[in-house]
Amino acid sequence: MQLLDGKALSLEIEAKVKEEVMILTSSRGVTPGLAVILVGSDPASQAYVNMKAKACKRAGIYSITHEMPESTTESQLLNAISILNNDPNIDGILVQLPLPKHINTAKVLEAIAPHKDVDGFHPQNVGRLTSNLGGFAPATPMGVMRLLQKYGIDPQGKNAVIVGASNIVGKPMASLLLNANATTTLCHIYTKDLASHTQNADILCVGVGKPNLITESMVKKGAVVIDIGINRLEDGSLVGDVDFASVAPKCSYITPVPGGVGPMTIASLLENTLKAAKTRQETPQS
């Protein structure tokens, strides 16, 4: 069993992004810019936003956080996005989820200009991903693919099973693996006999937010297990969705939690922001 070290790879990617940002700045006078919008004061969301801001600073990317109160109306949020869409200093726009219940999340994500949608949630980018036409892929699934690539794990011809069908992780993960020529199965809350699917997986990706959902008997020997879940237990410890102690000895590769997929999400966001800046320079937006 070998650990897929997302922390180490994320540092490699961050260093490469920093180098490319320096080249872009020195050759074209351009510094990539990321705007993050945070509505409300959810502690977990604030922590994620702070992590993104620190990563941007380390990589030389200009970042700004717009903190808006919980009482912010949908129209106020849409107006803030419109201003950022037209801001020449901003290449990427990210709205931290979840949003308060009175705001229509789909409408907000659709309001972000597709060429600034570094989260890859705009329907145009979702469609491009599904059709394998480029665009922006969501950061977490993109980070998983980079991990597989780093460790020489080729999805082509393999049975890939994804547990969790969210728009943020599960569905784009399935699209990326399908684009890489894996035979892809997407499981969700209504899937019958989950184990019968997971036991057939050469590559198993799990992201639902349930500690110990995947146990040793549900995984075949030699599988690659990607634990995308992150759960804080009552004792304060962080665990994934996979029972690591029992499953790990059975795997060829497995991601730890923390230190696996999490750091890769931030690294992929930096990559997407750099990509947005480069694309904007090559194809000026009207």
Curated annotation (Swiss-Prot):
Q: Name one GO cellular component term.
A: cytosol
Question: InterPro entries per the record?
Answer: Aminoacid_DH-like_N_sf, NAD(P)-bd_dom_sf, THF_DH/CycHdrlase, THF_DH/CycHdrlase_cat_dom, THF_DH/CycHdrlase_CS, THF_DH/CycHdrlase_NAD-bd_dom
Catalyses which reaction?
(6R)-5,10-methylene-5,6,7,8-tetrahydrofolate + NADP(+) = (6R)-5,10-methenyltetrahydrofolate + NADPH; (6R)-5,10-methenyltetrahydrofolate + H2O = (6R)-10-formyltetrahydrofolate + H(+)
**In which residues is NADP(+) bound?**
164-166, 189, 230
Which Cys residues form disulphide pairs?
A: none
Keywords on record: Amino-acid biosynthesis, Histidine biosynthesis, Hydrolase, Methionine biosynthesis, Multifunctional enzyme, NADP, One-carbon metabolism, Oxidoreductase, Purine biosynthesis
* One GO process term, biological-process aspect: tetrahydrofolate interconversion
An annotated Gene Ontology molecular function: methenyltetrahydrofolate cyclohydrolase activity
Q: In the UniProt record, does the keyword Hydrolase occur?
A: yes
Q: What is its EC number?
A: 1.5.1.5, 3.5.4.9
Give the pathway annotation: One-carbon metabolism; tetrahydrofolate interconversion
Please give the Pfam families that the UniProt record associates with this protein.
THF_DHG_CYH, THF_DHG_CYH_C
- Report quaternary structure and partners: Homodimer.
- Please report which protein family the annotation says this sequence is part of: Belongs to the tetrahydrofolate dehydrogenase/cyclohydrolase family.
Q: HAMAP family under this entry?
A: THF_DHG_CYH
Quote the function comment for this protein: Catalyzes the oxidation of 5,10-methylenetetrahydrofolate to 5,10-methenyltetrahydrofolate and then the hydrolysis of 5,10-methenyltetrahydrofolate to 10-formyltetrahydrofolate.
**What's this protein's name?**
Bifunctional protein FolD
Q: Which organism is it from?
A: Wolinella succinogenes (strain ATCC 29543 / DSM 1740 / CCUG 13145 / JCM 31913 / LMG 7466 / NCTC 11488 / FDC 602W) (Vibrio succinogenes)
What is the primary gene name for this protein? folD
